[in-house]
Amino acid sequence: MAGHSKWANIKHKKAAADAKRGKVWTRLIKEIQVAARMGGGDIDSNPRLRLAVEKAYDANMPKDNVNRAIQRGVGGVDGASYEEIRYEGYGIGGAAVIVDTMTDNRTRTVAEVRHAFSKNGGNMGTDGSVSFMFDHVGQFLFAPGTAEDKLMEAALEAGADDVVTNDDGSIEVLCPPNDFPKVKSALEAAGFKAELAEVTMKPQTEVEFTGEDAVKMQKLLDALENLDDVQEVYTNAAIADE
């Protein structure tokens, strides 16, 4: 990725998430509840739930919290009922932004998302206004220095679609979302532990941001990320390291 370091961006993202662990847990609990409600409470037959539970354990969430969230999802414990809503919009210079939320009050959520956009130089779009610029994929990112040939062989055998070496030396493995659990297990069995592993919306092309525009765009993304109902924020903005 010319002009910016994907590896540095990922490390920044991980550090920011670690700094907001309380919020991370809240997001994961919502994801576990919704995954269990939609696909049942058995992680062996519910790939989405299995991924959410793995993320929860990676974030050091206690097993009791995980089990309670699963029970709420399948109806065994009273609790708020969340629905998933996606919003699309534009950031600085028309950069594409997707905001995935889980909410028990869609009126509150849309107002908060719209306010975050408008206050920070962006604006809400309509359904489908920017999502066509992204691909829904499973993504794994490995540190610079990872054995590329061995990783590529293991990834392609596991069913990955593509293996990409970035300019900074980091390596990305991409796969269909439904194959994500299978590919993840196969890579780990081959001795490869990704620094980042997620099902994501990957931009087809990225727009480079530097200087003041980069600061403004990051401020908008942070404002959206900090909303309680927001689960994920995706953008095609590549914000250069200062």
Swiss-Prot record:
Coiled coil: none
Keyword Lipid biosynthesis: no
Top-level taxon: Bacteria
Matches recorded under InterPro entries: Integrase-like_N, TACO1_YebC-like_2nd/3rd_dom, TACO1_YebC_N, Transcrip_reg_TACO1-like, Transcrip_reg_TACO1-like_dom3, YebC-like
Cellular component, GO annotation: cytosol
Localization: Cytoplasm
Example GO molecular function: DNA binding
GO biological process, one term: regulation of DNA-templated transcription
Any Pfam family hit: Transcrip_reg
UniProt keywords, alphabetically: Cytoplasm, DNA-binding, Transcription, Transcription regulation
Family: Belongs to the TACO1 family.
UniProt-listed NCBIfam families: PRK00110.1, PRK12378.1, YebC/PmpR family DNA-binding transcriptional regulator
Protein name: Probable transcriptional regulatory protein Bphyt_1301
Organism expressing this protein natively: Paraburkholderia phytofirmans (strain DSM 17436 / LMG 22146 / PsJN)
